[in-house]
């Protein structure tokens, strides 16, 4: 049983660790942040009615995207929340590309610890470590007593509460939930969607490829007709038949090899696991189909059909070349982030030995992040902090936090405030025009804990256009070829197993990804493949799969 450390004991740790100054930062001394008398004086015994009669102040940490507004309280969403709740937040804001380094330091220093961490995105090992140290609070009682919006979500979808709860029955963080479709039609089933330039296809009189051989012939046509393509469309720079970023999430080309062997592909590009139809966890990166697929990608690379920068290029470089119109095939969550929608279509599943699309693990329960937001032992009135955070789960609030807002006179607005069929307030998506969905949202949204549910669409918010066309693509093009009955679910392991999996995965993932890139570039031999399998076993692959299997069995027990 996990030992729970009370706030009082945590304050003792602070005092021992850092003298009177640290104690002041943790809970006494100078009246700053949530330690003001107004916050401490609010008696919270159930749901809280906002706005509060007297303004209170909490402290919070959050991240912001590079190039966007760095001061959270300058964002319209937080301005409105302060007006609606009479709660002011003193923010510590960290640029997203510096978050992982700085959040670790801030969580270990009582002088920089805040009442809550809005965009924590902690891993399970982070959550359990901070829980054991007494730095974060278990939240299940606050959820039941002070968070009616989140409680309503859990009542409707009890699987989310299960996924938030550790093996000892505690909830250490508030989740991010985004439903867009479900099961095999969920928007998260495919991350690294492949797109093909239909303008080039039509210009060369080519058909949409449906097999790996046809695909290779199309790439060769792009390569061999580069001069005429450049002249026809006024393209500066070399024509690149296919570009990608190997081992880089949604930009990775692994979806192309899903048809080799038994058709498992490599949809889980971090853990490299898949689930068979008889509910066995396997390593996708040790299957013969995986090797055959990489051999084929090497053939394409050797034929100069793949961008030579695919192993090293940054996102900005990848996008820049795409915006210049130089790609025949590319990979991303949405091609609109790379080029435009008009000239591109999703590439269907390619038949090799079989025809299959493996959905991403965890995708059948839609978008879910267990460790999105935590409340720390610094909070003098955690029930009130939780009551304020519960406002993020209000049906009209969650879509704004997730995507953006309305009524911002100084910038582009994601939404217009409209009404639904019953005359009730509803957020209506404004046209994006030529703007990048990612860039527009980053300018307004605040992320954090939230829940956008499928039954909100048409009632509280319209479905985003870029989500709707992606949902349509998945349902029409990919779902029919999803022959797998299972994906690996989002499970919360024990502290011991989380630590062991983390340690094993560090070596396994690094080695698998290194070899994957090397074999696409240089090819492989039987001897190298056999050595690879032996090394993976030495790195603990069987133990790793055994732990994963244990939790899969428990999930379906």
Enumerate the predicted regions with their spans.
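Extracytoplasmic/periplasmic substrate-binding proteins
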Residues: 56, 62-73, 180-195, 202-208, ...
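Carboxylate/His-rich catalytic cores and anion/metal-binding grooves
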Residues: 138-159, 219-222, 237-266, 329-339
């Amino acid at each position: 049983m996990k030992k729970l450390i009370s706030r009082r004991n945590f304050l003792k740790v602070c005092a021992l660790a850092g003298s009177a100054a640290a104690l002041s930062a943790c809970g006494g001394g100078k009246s700053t942040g949530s330690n003001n008398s107004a916050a401490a004086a609010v008696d919270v015994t159930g749901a809280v009615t906002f706005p509060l009669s007297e303004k209170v102040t909490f402290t919070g940490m959050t991240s912001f995207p590079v190039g966007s507004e760095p001061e959270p309280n300058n964002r319209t969403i937080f301005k409105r929340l302060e007006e609606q709740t009479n709660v002011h937040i003193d923010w510590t804001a960290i640029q997203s590309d510096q978050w992982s380094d700085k959040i670790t330091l801030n969580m270990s220093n009582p002088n920089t610890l805040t009442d809550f961490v809005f965009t924590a995105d902690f891993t399970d090992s982070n959550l359990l470590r901070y829980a054991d140290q007494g730095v974060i609070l278990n939240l299940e009682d606050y959820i039941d007593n002070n968070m009616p919006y989140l409680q309503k979500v859990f009542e409707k979808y009890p699987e989310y509460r299960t996924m938030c709860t550790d093996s000892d029955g505690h909830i250490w963080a508030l989740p991010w939930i985004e439903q867009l479709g479900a099961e095999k039609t969920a928007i998260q089933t495919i991350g690294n969607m492949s797109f093909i330039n239909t303008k080039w296809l039509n210009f060369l009189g080519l058909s949409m490829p449906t097999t790996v051989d046809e695909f290779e012939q199309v790439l060769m046509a792009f390569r061999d007709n580069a001069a005429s393509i450049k002249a026809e469309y006024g393209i500066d720079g070399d024509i690149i038949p296919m570009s990608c970023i190997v081992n880089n999430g949604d930009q990775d080309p692994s979806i192309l090899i899903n048809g080799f062997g038994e058709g498992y592909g490599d949809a889980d590009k971090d853990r490299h696991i898949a689930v068979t139809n008889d509910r066995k966890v396997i390593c996708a990166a040790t299957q013969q189909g995986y090797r055959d697929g990489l051999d084929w990608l090497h053939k394409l690379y050797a034929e100069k059909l793949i961008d030579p920068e695919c192993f090293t290029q940054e996102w900005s470089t990848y996008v820049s070349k795409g915006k210049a119109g130089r790609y025949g095939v590319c990979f991303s969550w949405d091609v609109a982030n790379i080029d435009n929608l008009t000239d591109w279509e999703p590439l269907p599943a390619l038949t090799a030995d079989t025809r299959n699309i493996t959905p991403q693990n965890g995708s059948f329960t839609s978008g879910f992040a267990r460790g999105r937001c935590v409340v720390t032992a610094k909070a003098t009135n955690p029930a009130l902090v939780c009551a304020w955070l519960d406002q993020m789960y209000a049906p009209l609030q969650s879509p704004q936090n997730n995507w953006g807002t309305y009524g911002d006179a100084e910038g582009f607005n994601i939404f217009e405030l409209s009404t639904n069929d019953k005359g009730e307030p509803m957020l209506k998506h404004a046209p994006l025009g030529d703007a990048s969905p990612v860039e527009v949202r980053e300018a307004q949204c605040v992320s954090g804990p939230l829940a956008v549910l499928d039954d909100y669409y048409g009632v509280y918010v319209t479905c985003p256009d870029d989500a709707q066309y992606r949902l349509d693509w998945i349902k029409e093009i990919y779902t029919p070829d999803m022959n797998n009955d299972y994906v690996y679910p989002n499970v919360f392991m024990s502290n011991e197993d989380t630590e062991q999996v983390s340690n094993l995965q560090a070596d396994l993932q690094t080695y698998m990804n290194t070899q994957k890139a090397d074999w696409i570039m240089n090819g492989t031999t039987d001897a190298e493949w056999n050595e690879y399998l032996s090394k993976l076993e030495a790195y603990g692959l069987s133990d790793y799969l055994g732990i994963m299997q244990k939790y899969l069995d428990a999930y379906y027990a």
